[in-house]
Regions:
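N-terminal hydrophobic/helix-forming segments and targeting peptides
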Residues: 1-343
Length: 343
C-alpha cells in the first residue's frame, strides 16, 4: 500500500474532527482505533494512550516504536457566571487568537456551541484591563443564567468548533493538527509496514497528555519497552514575519531533530536513509530538551534510543494550524524505510 498525501490528509481530517483535549481523548482514541484496527489488536493504556503492534517481526530482531500524540489543546470550565463560562487553558494557547472564536462545550448532557467573548473596550471602565488574557475572556453560551447553571459545571471540557479546511496547494488548516497530522503520518507508515512485514517488530503508540506533560508517552514507552523509537510531532513552520533561522518551510520535508536527549547514531541513520532515497529533509538542532514526547520516551523503563521527526506547522496552538500533507507523507515514508533497512 503506497503512502499518499490524499490518504494522509483524509486520516488527518477524520482525527481532527474527533475532540480530544489532554486527559479527555476518548473520541480521538475511537477515531484512531478505527484506522489502526485493520493492522493489529488495539489496546488502551490506563492513561488513555493507544498501543497497537502492527508487525511482530522475527525473534531477536530490534523492536521499533512509532509515536505521535493524540491529545490536543483546549479549555476547561472553571466557573459558571450569569450564563457565561469562565475557563482556563488545557495546554499552551495563544490568547490573542481567541476573541470571537466559536467553541464547543462538552457537558454531561451533550455538546453545546459557544462563542469566546469579553467586555467590549468602549463599554469597560477607564481603569479596566483591555489586554487579551484568558482571565478577561468568557464563553457566551446563549443561555439564561438559570439554564446555564443547570447545563454546565466546572470541569467541563471545551474545544474549538472549527473543522479542517483545504487551502490552495492542498494544504490543510484547522485545529488539532498538532499532532493529529503526526498521528496520520504514523498510521500511514504502519499501513506500509503491516503490508511489507519487515524483520523488526513495530509497535504504534498514539499517546495521551503530551500537551500537559507527556505522561501518556512515558507510560506507553514503559509498557511497550522498545529498543528504538521515533517520535513524530510538529514544529515551527515558516510564515509572514517569522525569522527563517527559527522556522522551516512548509513543503520542505520532515524536520530531523538533533538534541542531547536524542540518540545520535539512530538520528544519523535516518539522515543517511533520507539522503540515499531522495526524501526531502530539514534539520532542527536543539541545545537541550526537545519539548516533545521524545524527552519522556527516552527515559521510559530502561531507556529508549530516540529519534525525532517534526512536521512544519504554521500558527501553532491556534484554531488555524496549517500544514502541507506532503511533509507528513515524507515523514511516513522515512519511518517505513527505516524498518526495511535495519538498524
Amino acid at each position: 500500500m503506497s503512502i499518499t498525501t490524499e490518504r494522509i490528509a483524509a486520516a488527518a481530517r477524520k482525527l481532527c474532527e474527533a475532540p480530544g483535549p489532554s486527559g479527555r481523548e476518548c473520541a480521538a482514541y475511537a477515531a484512531a482505533k478505527e484506522l489502526l484496527s485493520p493492522m493489529g489488536e488495539v489496546k488502551r493504556t490506563p492513561l488513555g494512550s493507544l498501543l497497537c503492534c502492527v508487525n511482530e517481526g522475527k525473534e531477536g530482531a530490534p523492536h521499533l516504536l512509532l509515536e505521535a500524540h493524540l491529545d490536543q489543546i483546549g479549555f476547561i470550565v472553571t466557573r459558571v457566571e450569569e450564563g457565561f463560562l469562565r475557563f482556563s487553558k488545557v495546554g499552551g494557547i495563544d490568547a490573542r487568537w481567541l476573541p470571537a472564536t466559536p467553541v464547543v462545550i462538552h457537558a454531561a448532557a451533550g455538546d453545546y456551541p459557544g462563542i469566546i467573548t469579553s467586555v467590549p473596550p468602549h463599554l469597560a471602565g477607564d481603569g479596566s484591563d483591555h489586554s487579551i488574557k484568558i482571565e478577561n475572556l468568557l464563553i457566551d453560551t446563549g443561555f439564561t443564567a438559570e439554564t446555564a447553571a443547570k447545563l454546565f459545571a466546572p470541569g467541563d471540557i471545551v474545544t474549538f468548533a472549527a473543522k479542517p479546511v483545504e487551502l490552495l496547494n492542498k494544504r490543510l488548516a484547522g485545529p488539532a493538527l498538532d499532532d493529529r497530522i503526526g498521528c496520520a503520518a504514523v498510521i500511514a507508515a504502519a499501513e506500509e509496514i503491516a503490508a511489507e512485514k519487515p524483520d523488526c517488530k513495530v509497535t504504534v503508540l498514539l499517546s495521551s497528555m503530551e500537551e500537559v506533560g507527556g505522561q501518556g508517552a512515558e507510560t506507553g514507552g514503559f509498557t511497550s519497552q522498545p529498543d528504538y523509537a521515533i517520535a513524530v510531532d510538529v514544529s515551527f513552520g515558516d510564515g509572514f514575519g517569522c525569522a527563517p533561522e527559527k522556522t522551516s518551510p512548509l513543503g520542505g520535508g520532515t524536520m530531523l531533530g538533533y538534541a542531547p536527549t536524542l540518540n545520535r547514531d539512530f538520528t544519523l541513520k535516518l539522515k543517511k536513509l533520507a539522503e540515499e532515497n531522495n526524501i526531502p529533509l530539514q534539520h532542527e538542532p536543539m541545545g537541550g530538551r526537545t519539548g516533545t514526547d521524545a524527552d519522556e520516551l527516552a527515559t521510559a523503563g530502561r531507556g529508549i534510543k530516540m529519534a525525532l521527526l517534526s512536521i512544519p506547522l504554521r500558527s501553532m496552538h491556534t484554531v488555524a494550524e496549517t500544514i502541507d500533507p506532503e511533509d507528513a507523507a515524507n515523514t511516513a515514508r522515512l519511518m517505513a524505510l527505516a524498518t526495511k533497512e535495519g538498524f
